[in-house]
Regions:
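Long, ordered, helix-rich scaffold segments
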Residues: 361, 390, 470, 481-482, ...
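Glycine/proline-rich low-complexity spacer/linker segments in large multi-domain proteins
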Residues: 24-27, 107, 116-165, 212-220, ...
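N-terminal, polar/Ser/Thr-rich
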Residues: 18-49, 75, 133-138, 158, ...
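A surface-exposed beta-strand-loop module
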Residues: 71-133, 188-189, 511-518
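Beta-strand-rich binding/interaction modules
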Residues: 73-80, 445-446, 458-526
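Hydrophobic helix-coil surface modules that form long, contiguous segments used
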Residues: 50, 140-144, 154-310, 339-342, ...
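Surface-exposed beta-strand/loop patches in extracellular or lumenal glycoproteins
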Residues: 53-71, 165-171, 431, 475-491
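Hydrophobic alpha-helical and helix-loop surface patches within well-folded domains
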Residues: 74, 82, 196, 222-482, ...
């Protein structure tokens, strides 16, 4: 670490921050200080009424006030100061901004902006919306990122961090929830009015409420009140989450060195939910299937709820207590929450073996695309936030993990604690984080990290035998990308004269020579796979490395294989050389390494067609059947998490491609059993079986799937079946699409059904005919976030004719939907890249399959 401290001081590569623009934000001369919101809500009504009072401080004379609203009907807008009242006229501007004027200048001072309005309870999973379950309606909210303005007028920006006070009237039979404890509750003529305590300062996107006939169970062991609320009749399915939440919260309090900062902690299982969960202050909302895993779920069903709960509770500090100043730093929230959740899983639940999971691998693929934007980018509208949203989580988390590995966990934790203390109840920017990390570690963290967060992609680091090291932007073969440079601290493992040693160097130019790297038998350039870069070494070193695989950890073995796959896709490694890596690692016995082999084999799917599918099936069987024979199809209590996951992935790939009788019989049996008597403990294997059966299934099978789907009350069962409706052929496809558009499939799940069916059709023409006819209806049903991404869900292809078909559709219609043009740009570029790769490797791949089938 001392060496790193010195070399970090020499960092020279930086990227200038983007210039801030404010045409899409309200004026900074008027600042909110407090907001009261009074709502009248009924889950059985499609509209609601509201009154809000926004307390404002006007710093300089202005001609108008500005606030946000979207889809609301403003009935009265007045400005108050003491006993004086001025009616205001309101004109809509861009970006949902409203200009309110009294007709005269507004002098500096304190004012109250009072607005009476009506709004709509939608069913598309954003704003204030309704979910339906078992014949009952439930209102919940999703205000991140720019959807609070759909429920109440206000300063809907993350740096407008103020206290709120909510008052909600609703029919007496309903449970009414919000961010804070109830202050008082009055009931008159069957209508309750619930007054909630004032909140701590928070941004508008964290305001939340829920109304419905909820059941609940207490969250055990908390120092503050807390319950899990579920749709009626499902509270007992929340017991696992209820009994694990307190230990998760205690871990986070210990790490941050301060107690949970709010007065209560409630969870709500929401039947219709676009994302996984939402970290609303004191009222965290989740997709039902995440929270409702029963009392004692099997090991395979535990990691998702634990991880998601940890992520959301980490947000109580990262994001809620300390909030990013604007949406261009959303990664500060999401990356830190993901980082903390993974650390917690390693420390608190080692049985899930998070230590061997490579988060960077989730980011490398999308980050390599020529269309990818930086994590820190200009954000004007909601579609900009969602553009590349996943990299806020995965790339951001990978970068934080890398920083921690470089400066040490103690220094990292000290910086986090200082950051939380300094910016509590305030907003922060990335530079604020870099400053405290630099102070705690005595290393210039910011100079390096800006090169990764303020420009897209990452470096490919190339080593030569003479110690020369070069860097250039990693990209897929044939892609046209600009030249870029990064500051790359490299932690190396190398073998020389029979001894394995570690070495740390700093690559801060496009090309440098390091004499310490000469005459090595091999160099492994990414110790413990902590760094965020790809690498290439001379072929003779790679050959020698494959003879020394026992010298590497599980993380390093997995990263070696994934790195080789990346080099193949970039045209930086030949097919034969890549297969030598794959074949060597396929002999490894560790289940985590074996699962990476399965993943890479599945990555060949873009090269599979009707002519070589049978040969590929035989090839996959030859590499994996021994695992199938050893692991079987039944999850056992004594299995490790890695064994469980390997069983699932092996069976998933074999059942899709292999004609092995035992495999196909197992798929039919598992599918039949699950459809007739779905059990959560068999869900993971059943999911693979159902997908395998569907791709060969007929009308009778589809009828069985639909019957099981419509008769189940279990969100997890529904999720499995919905994602397995990948039936082939026009007739079955149209039947599934009709199902997707019906009330059987809720708006948040509609695109998962449509994507599953669209991506498996041999003939794309009928699907695009359907999409062209039904796009408007589809866009009205699904969440806005899904509308922008329709091309990415259904139009990724590796066929030039299909790309042309999609292009004809989107060139005519995408402009009518915010963000869809960008969505098609991403999907089209990805598809064209796939065509390029297919042309490059198809002949070689077919020859390899032929040669492999001839080897006995």
């Amino acid at each position: 670490m001392k060496y790193l401290t010195l070399i970090f001081a020499l960092l020279v590569f930086t990227v200038s921050a983007q210039a801030e623009t404010v045409d899409y934000r309200v004026s900074g001369d008027v600042n909110p200080e407090f907001q009261a919101i009074t709502l009248t809500l009924d889950p059985d009504m499609s509209t609601f009424t509201g009154v809000t009072e926004i307390h404002l401080a006007v710093a300089a004379e202005v001609s108008r006030l500005e606030f946000y609203q979207s889809g609301l009907s403003l009935e009265s807008v007045v400005l108050q100061q003491g006993e004086q009242t001025w009616p205001m006229t309101v004109k809509a501007a861009q970006h949902d901004i409203q200009h309110a004027s009294t007709g005269a200048k507004i002098a500096p001072g304190k004012y109250v902006l009072k607005i009476s309005y009506q709004g709509k309870i939608n069913d598309t999973s954003d704003g204030a919306y309704v979910s339906r379950f078992d014949g009952r309606n439930y209102i919940s909210t999703q205000f991140e990122d720019m959807h609070a303005r759909k429920a109440f007028p206000g300063i809907d920006e993350p740096d407008a961090k103020i206290p709120y006070q909510l008052t909600i009237s609703a029919p007496e039979k309903h449970v009414v929830l919000s961010n804070t404890p109830v202050s008082t509750r009055n009931v008159t003529d069957g209508v309750q009015t619930v007054y909630f305590e004032k909140t701590k300062p928070m941004p508008s996107y964290l305001v939340a409420f829920a109304v419905g006939e909820f059941d609940s169970v207490p969250i055990e062991g908390l120092s503050i009140p807390g319950r899990i609320y579920t749709p009626k009749g499902q509270s007992q399915d929340a017991l696992f989450a209820a009994r694990r939440t307190a230990e998760i919260l205690r871990y986070l309090e210990a790490y941050f060195g301060q107690p949970y900062p709010y007065k209560k902690l409630d969870f709500v299982a929401v039947p219709t939910f676009t994302h996984g969960a939402m970290e609303n202050v004191g009222l965290v909302t989740y997709r039902s299937e995440i929270l409702l895993r029963g009392e004692n779920p099997v090991l395979a069903e535990q990691s998702t709820p634990l991880m998601v709960i940890a992520h959301e509770l980490a947000h109580m500090w990262y994001g809620n207590l300390v909030t990013m100043a604007w949406w261009d730093d959303l990664w500060l929230n999401e990356a830190f929450a993901s980082f903390m959740a993974a650390r917690l899983m390693q420390d608190l639940y080692p049985e899930h073996n998070y230590e061997t999971r490579l988060v960077a691998e989730r980011a490398f693929g999308p980050d390599a695309a020529a269309t990818t934007k930086p994590v820190k980018k200009t954000v004007r509208v909601a579609a900009d936030v969602m553009d590349g949203l996943g990299l806020n989580y995965s790339k951001g988390e990978a970068i934080l993990h890398w920083i921690e590995s470089q400066i040490g966990s103690d220094a990292f934790q000290a910086a986090v604690r200082e950051y939380m203390t300094e910016f509590a109840w305030r907003n922060a920017k990335a530079d604020d984080l870099w400053r405290v990390l630099t102070k705690a570690s005595k290393t210039d963290v910011g100079s390096m990290m800006r090169t990764y967060l303020e420009q897209p992609s990452y470096p490919l680091v190339v080593f030569d035998v003479d110690g020369e090291v070069q860097q250039r932007r990693y990209h897929l073969t044939g892609a046209d990308v600009p030249e870029q440079a990064w500051t790359v601290p490299l932690s190396l493992k190398l073998k020389r004269d029979g001894k394995i040693v570690t070495q740390q160097i700093l690559l801060n130019a496009e090309q440098q020579t390091f004499p310490a790297l000469t005459n090595a038998d091999w160099i492994y350039p990414n110790t413990e796979a902590n760094g965020y870069y790809r690498w290439r070494i001379p072929q003779q070193q790679l050959t020698a490395m494959l003879q020394d695989l026992d010298a590497f950890t599980v993380r390093e073995k997995k990263a070696l294989l994934y790195n080789a796959e990346a080099l193949l896709n970039a045209g930086e490694m030949g097919f034969a050389e890549f297969m030598s890596v794959l074949e060597a690692l396929s002999l490894q016995k560790d289940p985590a390494v074996a699962r990476s082999v399965v993943s890479v084999l599945a990555g060949f799917e873009y090269l599979i067609d009707a002519e070589n599918e049978a040969a590929f099936g035989r090839f996959v069987e030859s590499r994996l059947i021994h695992w199938f024979d050893a692991l079987g199809t039944v999850d056992r209590e004594q299995d490790s998490d890695d064994q469980l996951r390997l069983r699932h992935s092996v069976f998933g790939l074999l059942s899709k491609y292999s004609d092995n009788e035992a495999v196909q019989n197992a798929a039919n049996d598992l599918a039949t059993q699950f459809l007739s008597n779905p059990q959560l403990e068999h869900r993971q294997m059943a999911a693979r079986a159902l997908r395998a059966v569907a791709q060969r299934g007929d009308e009778k099978w589809l009828a069985r799937y639909e019957k099981a789907l419509t008769s189940s009350r279990d969100a997890n069962v529904k999720s499995v079946i919905q994602r397995a409706l990948n039936f082939k052929g026009e007739k079955l496809m149209l039947a599934v699409l009709d199902l997707a558009m019906s009330d059987t499939i809720n708006p948040a799940d509609t695109m998962s059904v449509i994507s599953a069916i669209a991506m498996v059709q041999d003939d794309p023409v009928p699907f695009y005919a359907w999409l062209s006819k039904n796009l408007e209806l589809l866009a009205k049903k699904i969440p806005d976030y899904h509308v922008t991404r329709i091309p990415q869900y259904v139009s990724r292809s590796c066929d030039a004719d299909t790309i042309k078909l999609a292009d004809e559709l989107y060139s005519n219609v995408a402009g009518a939907y915010e963000g869809m043009t960008r969505g098609w740009e991403i999907a089209k570029a990805s598809s064209e890249q796939c065509v390029t790769l297919k042309k490059r490797y198809q002949t070689t791949f077919n020859a390899y399959l032929t040669a492999s089938s001839s080897i006995k």
